[in-house]
Amino acid sequence: MIAVLFNMVPLFAEEYEISTANTTLLLETSIGRRVNFVYYGPRPATPDEIYSTGSDIRWNAYPCFGTNCTCEHALAVTHANGDVSLELATQDVKQYTDPDGGRVWEFLMKDKVFPFYVKQFYKAYDECDIIKTWTEMWHTEKKTITLDKFASAYIPVKSGDLYLSYLAGGWGAEAQLFEERITRGRKTIGNHDGARTSFNGNPSFMVSLDGPAQENSGNVLGGTLAYTGNYDLSFVKNGNANHLEITAGINAELSQYKLDPKVTFTTPEFIFTYSTEGKGGISRNLHRWGRNYQIIGGTDSREILLNSWEGVYFKVNQEGMNAMMRDFAAIGGELFVMDDGWFGDKYPRDNETTSLGDWVVSTKKLPEGINALIDEAERNGIKFGIWIEPEMTNTKSELYEKHPDWVLRQPDREPFKGRGDTQLMLDLCNPEVQDHVFGVVDNLMQAHPRIYYMKWDANMSMNNASSLYLPKDRQSHLYIEYHRGLMNVCKRIREKYPDLIIQLCASGGGRLNYGFFPYFNECWSSDNTDAIQRLYIQCGMSHFYPANIMASHVSASPNHQTKRVVPLKFRFDVAMTGRLGMEMKPSDLTEKEMEFAKNAIGTYKSIRPVIQQGDLYRLISPYEEKPYVSLMYCTPEKDRAVYFLFRRSYLRDTWEDARKLAGLDPDRNYMIREINAADPQKKVYLDGKVVSGRFLMENGFRLNLGQDMSSIVLELIAQ
């Protein structure tokens, strides 16, 4: 009997080494046994080094509730007969290479009693030091079962002096960085909004393994969940296990999923990485992966655009748009985007209370139509874009009058209304609504095929959590099926219009998430365009997302949100750290300011490849609350770099520290040039100097900015 058992279950598990250029994830399993998570961290010379140093964990790689699992679990189900137990055992392991070059491992597991199956995937991207994981699950039980929890990933981390870095915030204050020590208990980063899932938090984190996180040194684990809906990241540390347990996945609260036989449920992808170069190393890994593998058009150059919103708000008219385009083209602009206020026939869009859903041009506002605007744009040598909010409607609209059953609402309650006390969300669980939302883009493109860019907005939370389309016993599917419907629409759009540039917007940066970026080229970072505030917002974003998705616009002074007066140079220099744009009427600038703006736009064009495709080094964070903020970008080849220094406030008794750089080649010399100078005839003393990369990184230079909201930009060119 014992001999037969040994033949069925091997005595020793087989190791599966999932390695990238600098990291290794080590798993072990054998047929009939569970998959164990053994190690994740710096790549060893051999796996023996992991064991000989006590670095192995050997913990269940995907713990299931119900059988000897009192720790955090990744999966919990209720079977058709009411049983809540699971015990997964490996049936098969496969390895192959995807068309994009990523290497994939599949672990097929089955419950030891019930015909319930889980396939766990790991995909490695060598040059980015990125691994992503997700699961598929299905069953062949006779009746429907319930998925009570269904995480994408479970990662155990050896206990130590652990610190958590994450983003949180709200409208006008997105992506604020928070850092705290991980103590015993549970820390959760989650979202229940349903639509705008990045205001309260962001499904991304870093864990420093050896004390407070440092920018360019130290061991750090980072991760992000690529999911557009409600999510949950949990960090659990207790006395029963000598490690931190991290789970990431769909927020299962109010989303229990009834899974029918032979139907496959797929969890979102969780992307994780490890670096011995601190938080900066995590950021650079994610940026590189995002640009090359996740963001549509991620390696393409992004145009410098003017958005009409803060210039005219709802006061859109033919001559006003033409004038803005002419003025912007005159200073070197490349793309004009007409924001809210252009549509509505029966109900012209004069304010926020009407017209959403009626995506036809308002002949009252634009009697010559959109094609005439595109003609004017092309006469001035620029491209044309337009704003839409296709997931929404107003109660005062032709769409709502025709299809009141298309909105999310409880059948026996008055719906809660959003913006303007008239806005409602459409029910994207409904295939007819999906066709309508696809048609918003398709009809515009069919009528105006020269539209180059669309800004896709979403200005309401999912406040009415009920679908008139879903069956009564599947209402808990709402949060999941809505986003499945949205992704279905996005896929259809991309299949038909692969080259259309689409900006992701949700009352600002409310949808900052890698789950959207296979379909959206960039993100509107925040409705708050104040340059000082943007230093914080864009620094937070940069921890996980690259500069080329970060729409950063120069707006009026005083700023419309904060009323702060900020010099034009400072506003441009801050905006240049992302994808440069403008959010104002150029005609409001003086002649001297117009000349500066023209030169600044020309300067950005010359450094655009470095900013949008370079490696980021955060040198002085705004969250350090020092007078200065500093960052720089270097090309991967280290032949060009751009350095930014901002002075927020002047403190007379503050000594000037040496400005040490990062990311340069220590064995090359660099010519330093001041660019975007306020006065080209009065450049900084460093202009024209040649200094070695080693000296610039180890010693740095002294540079004093003598007043509030002053800034300087330096370009470094390898000799």
What name fits each language-model region?
Residues 203-207, 215, 622-666:
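Carbohydrate-binding surface patches
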Residues 297-439, 448, 453:
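Aromatic-lined carbohydrate-binding/catalytic grooves of carbohydrate-active enzymes
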Residues 14-27, 31-238, 253, 669-685:
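Polysaccharide-binding surfaces and accessory modules of carbohydrate-active proteins
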